[in-house]
Amino acid sequence: KYLARSFFFLLYQFIHTKYRRVEVAFVAHHTTAREVTEEEFFHKGEAGGTLISSGYQRALEIIEARYHPSLWNVYAFHCSDGDNFDSDNPAALRLAQELAATCNLFGYGEIKPLGTRHYESSMLGMFRRLEADNFQTVLIESREDVWPSFRALLAKDRAVK
């Protein structure tokens, strides 16, 4: 959780310095997704099984309701340990493709701290095959990876090209 929160805090600070008018929507998910407050996002965690598609679906609903891409620069970022129910992978991939098509930038960061059970997750491997010029995956294993991962994600921002 520390690595993901560090990454999101850095991202949050960057966005607030780059843009004058910023609105951030935080989505938390396990088997269901919900929009949460900034406080809940940074200080509480979700537990239980994971359906990544629920988070992506909720993000798309929020974008459709409040942040039409013709009026907003829309960015979506997701950090995860990479675990997902196998049965959800096709839906997660389809919705990730839809987020990439909708957003200026969509990034996926997989958090695998050094010294923990490390494996190539089905999510990271699957998402690395997703072809979109504004979609980027990163692997974050330590504090030292947070800044380079942040820079790698922002390099795919199609709003600045």
Spell out what each predicted region is.
Residues 1-161:
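Acidic, glycine-rich A-domain
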